[in-house]
Amino acid sequence: MTMKKSIIAFPRIGSNRELKFALEKYFRKEITEEELQTVAKEIRLENWKSQKEAGIDSPISNDFSFYDQTLDLSIALGAIPGSYKNLELSELDTLFALARGFQDEQNDVKARPMKKWFNTNYHYLVPEINKDTIIKANFSKLLNEYKEAKSAGFETRPTIIGPYTFLVLADYKSGATKDTVLSDVIVAFQTLLKELNQLGVEWLQIEEPALVLDQTEEEKKLFVSIYEELLKSKNNLNILLQTYFGDVRDSYKEIIKLDFDGIGLDFIEGRDSLALIQKYGFPKKKILFAGLVNGKNIWRNNYQKTLELLTALDEVADIVINTSCSLQHVPVTIKNETKLSKEILKHFSFATEKLNEIDEISDIYFNKNTSFLKKNVELFENERVRENSKLKQKLDKLTEKDFTRQPSLVERRASQSQSLNLPVLPTTTIGSFPQTAEVRKVRLQNKRGELRQADYDTFLEEKIKECLKLQEDIGLDVLVHGEFERNDMVEYFGEKLEGYVFTQKAWVQSYGTRCVKPPIVWTDVTRPEAMTVRWSAYAQSQTSKPVKGMLTGPVTILNWSFPREDISLKASTLQLALAVQEEVLDLEKAGIKIIQIDEAALREKLPLRKSDWYKEYLDWAIPAFRLVHSKVKPETQIHTHMCYSEFEDIIPSIDAMDADVISFEASRSELSIIDALKAHHFKTLVGPGVYDIHSPRIPSVKEIQNQLEKILDKLPIEQVWVNPDCGLKTRGNAETIPSLRHLVEATRVLRKEKVVYDK
């Protein structure tokens, strides 16, 4: 089959989040596994239909997952830690135990660690390799989904994460190394190739995004050794090596020498992809799958620029128009958006629309059909938005002084200690409290205009009072108002700022059942009025304990939005920083003594290659955070929070944010960050999360006590705060309340053991 139009993968949540809702019903035991599988099958069928109808030559199979594709591969290879095997659950329930943890009368196992998938807001479950790991091939999921598509009339290209990326991302325990399982992993993949040959499959797509990371010589040799051996088994099967999220500069010369039939390169984030081809050439007998349509943003493709790039690739004999990465990072379709005007929607392209863009670009380039080009050129010729001149003047006037808080961290600490009068090991939460069906219902009624604002405000006041009373009863030291007025930590602020537009159903998977609806930065961003002061001030008026003001930081707001492409990320972030700074100062004026500015997504846009970290990102992202709090009083304590990323290698930059307290996700990662904090002589006070809120299991007092003891073995008690690892919005009260009681009880035990007076 001749291919000209391709994608890497398609969203798997369903156009109306059908998978999320089915999974949640399954977890609540409201539907059977068979009913869950039926929903999954319907989503897959709809996805294949959409691709085929848009002219995609080879729709993708095995891009579906009930939770995470990396976890699927771990299971396919048999890389399942013994504690999960011993549960003796079904294969599907074992998968969910790995992802969510499992707790019953006889068993109690934690969920596997999650990490951000390269530089995205998607999270993967980290594979574990230990001395007891026995790799054994079981690719029934991939094979069954291929056969399912075939029986429905679709000849698909199965996709799978490759052995190199699997080995690079895995966590090695009890003395195990890559070499421990290398030969067995290769044999397992050889088994897969044999089975695909027997089925008559034409193409297999092997995803190796780890090739865009900095590679050591040892890693380069590992990659080559894997594929020199594996490709001997391909027989009649065509193998596509698919890369994304950057370029493969370290191993391009080796890649083009290997016996791949197709090579997928990213020309959106792959800064050097074109230069590599121009310098080293591209083999005439191989097909280039050119990632020209952005799989991570929602703006229309500029066909003229894409055609210029294709022209520069003229020497390549065989080209397929492809996405730059999986489309799972964008919403499914704009067809669900009925409230945005056509004038706005015409600038957007979600996953389904990107299929059409690929079809049109292909028609223009291969068939010289210029009708689509003319319309696209007109779209980009017209000015979309105008610059805010007042905002530009403010930004132009910024000096180094605006990015520096005085006095120093150590001097401020004394003022804050006196002002707040907190015990050693202060206890708090990260911000949000469980949002019940009632809260979501009332908030939606208000949004639709079905509830008077005064009645809604009264409802929120009651919920805040309940939340404060609960926290006081539990014994927490620093309280939060619960964030019941907020649907999402980014969308809420976007709605209060000028410059954003919002969708109804543009959902994107973050992990498992967790979906987010990123707002879209449409134009220059400003703050017309206070956003959070009303509720923070009310909460503080109801208690004598300090209540944290809760904000999302500028870097995270941008990283969890769909950013503009007509100005730089730095420019957008500084606009947001000025807006958040205004809010911080208003909270301080309202008597809020502790203000938390979450930067949960700080790591997300960090370039994947270390040589680009500072110039391309940290040199402006860290100052943007400092700009937000540079003008507050010494006695105002600034907190920030970060979650589910690897921070160990940027600890000095995090310290340079100059916050007074930083809380980290640490429970799933087994407190690995503590060693890095100690090694770098981290000065900021820290709250490493002592239990995992993304799992429904309830930690015991002893478990939290053990976590705290591990922390205090490495950090001085005066430096430590005690908190969960993230906000509690997605949990239920049934788990949250006992977990927090256990947290406070464990803290009090430690205070007594350390002979510290508990206030």
UniProtKB/Swiss-Prot annotation:
Cofactor or coenzyme needed: Zn(2+)
Molecular-function annotations in GO: 5-methyltetrahydropteroyltriglutamate-homocysteine S-methyltransferase activity; zinc ion binding
Residues the record lists as binding L-homocysteine: 430-432, 483, 598
Reactions mediated catalytically: 5-methyltetrahydropteroyltri-L-glutamate + L-homocysteine = tetrahydropteroyltri-L-glutamate + L-methionine
EC number: 2.1.1.14
Catalytic residues (UniProt): 694
Residues at which 5-methyltetrahydropteroyltri-L-glutamate binds: 17-20, 116, 514-515, 560, 604
Pathway involvement of the protein, from the record: Amino-acid biosynthesis; L-methionine biosynthesis via de novo pathway; L-methionine from L-homocysteine (MetE route): step 1/1
Binding site for L-methionine: 430-432, 483, 598
Co-factor note (free text): Binds 1 zinc ion per subunit.
InterPro entries the UniProt entry points to: Cbl-indep_Met_Synth_N, Cobalamin-indep_Met_synthase, Met_Synth_C/arc, UROD/MetE-like_sf
GO BP annotations listed: methionine biosynthetic process; methylation
Binding locations of Zn(2+): 641, 643, 665, 726
Protein family per UniProt: Belongs to the vitamin-B12 independent methionine synthase family.
Name of this chain's protein: 5-methyltetrahydropteroyltriglutamate--homocysteine methyltransferase
Species, as recorded: Lactococcus lactis subsp. lactis (strain IL1403) (Streptococcus lactis)
Gene expressing this chain: metE
